[in-house]
Amino acid sequence: MEKKSVLILGTASHVGKSSVVTAICRILSREYRVAPFKAQNMSLNSWITKDGKEIGIAQAIQAKAAGTEPTADMNPVLLKPKGDCVSQIILLGEPYADRSAGKYYESIAEMNEVLEGALKRLCNEHDIIVMEGAGGAAEINLYERDIVNIGTARLTQAPIILVGDIERGGVFASLYGTVALLPEDVRKNVKGFIINKFRGDLEILKPGLKQLEEKTGIPVLGVLPYFKLNIPSEDSVSLEDKEAEKNEKEIEIAVIRLPRISNFTDFEPLERSAKIRYVELDEDLGTPDAIMIPGTKNTVNDLLDLKASGMAEKIQAFKGKIPIFGICGGYQMLGKTIYDSGVENGVEAEFEGLGLLDIGTKFGEYKKRTIQVTKKVSAYGPILAPIDGEEIKGYEIHMGITDSCRNIFGNDGAIDKAGLVIGTYLHGLFDNKNIRDALMQYLYEKKGLEYIPENSMTESDAYEELANVVEQNLDMEKFYEIIGI
């Protein structure tokens, strides 16, 4: 590839590739026109571009860090797991097909053509392309059909930087082993290592760094400290980490961890003021201060699982007592009925919802609504009435049409008579400070606590914070030399 570029690969999933790319995009954007690129992403969390295309949320974040508008070319192939070894394929931001892994691999040649076109368009509009691999780079069973690691490396011939995670142990073996297993034509382009999530005394680590460099002939560009990010998470591994985190806040919000959960980043903004507890269907719901039902890749099947587990009855028992929010698929579940023509579950049928909202949803065709929106709050009740008439922003990613006689955000959403059960199709709802503060004000006052609205860190501040950490701990002179600037 003639354009300046760099490919960030990893030894495994969740080693920090996306964060490193975000930081690099921010750093380079100070002097160059930069674009992120990930040929193929598998993610439960997605983002809608201004022109209504769906991409992985990580690439949207990276683009914004680079100061450029997110586009479908930055993530030409998005795989959204639906369960039962089937994923929905999003091609250049549009729904393409639902396929098993085996069937998907049969169309790799077609996918390659798509990503090559996307990459060419990005190169025409930007000075530097910062590319990201997926999972572990050394998946030797997938080399011949891997488009995101080996495929991208071979297509672009870009210099490669390999990221390893020291937090989970075995980082030296992971880095050395990954390099050893890479095909020779790819291995020769590995120009540096980054060790991520380090806690402790760097002096103790240095002998290992030296031996790694001697054994591989590849320099360690830097050791990045463990750092709590203030940007949205990408995948379900992040969700596991959240569940392990300690949170001593006095307000507890239970998020139902649906088997096919999607866009759980919707609730991350609430972590600043409340303890967010992800509850499995077979777990005790406890006595939360509020309940959230998130989006899902299959509303019907998750609704059936919710009922079979007994969790549906537990949620229904809280009606009128605490706030219950449903977003996207969770909103659909809150209604009285869901009619499926076969789009969701393969057969035509009508299902009874939770009955907490006076709405009904119909899945009539394989068609997804993807759009960024600005809405005006028009609602009553103890939570939303204080912000009646104010604007909020969000984005929609859903199939199905819902009929509601009590819209609360323009022509979207619904609310019960008490104003405590609230449903909406808007992802990013709690990114709106007025919505977030309205909910927290209600929850804090109900417990006799004083709510002090947080001073929200802006997106730009978060990107700068991350970029500064990376810049301070990376050999930037060597990095610039590697990418040729």
From Swiss-Prot:
Q: Which InterPro entries match?
A: Class_I_gatase-like (IPR029062), CobQ/CobB/MinD/ParA_Nub-bd_dom (IPR002586), CobQ_GATase1 (IPR033949), CobQ_N (IPR047045), CobQ_synth (IPR004459), GATase_3 (IPR011698), P-loop_NTPase (IPR027417)
| CDD domains, per the entry | CobQ_N, GATase1_CobQ
A GO molecular function held by the record: catalytic activity
Transmembrane recorded as keyword: no
Pfam families membership: CbiA, GATase_3
Name the catalytic site residues.
Answer: C328 (nucleophile), H427
Q: Which Gene3D superfamilies match?
A: 3.40.50.880, P-loop containing nucleotide triphosphate hydrolases (3.40.50.300)
Which chain regions cross the lipid bilayer? none
Functional description taken from the UniProt entry = Catalyzes amidations at positions B, D, E, and G on adenosylcobyrinic A,C-diamide. NH(2) groups are provided by glutamine, and one molecule of ATP is hydrogenolyzed for each amidation.
Record protein name field: Probable cobyric acid synthase
- Originating organism: Methanosarcina barkeri (strain Fusaro / DSM 804)
Its organism's taxonomic lineage begins at: Archaea, Methanobacteriati, Methanobacteriota, Stenosarchaea group, Methanomicrobia
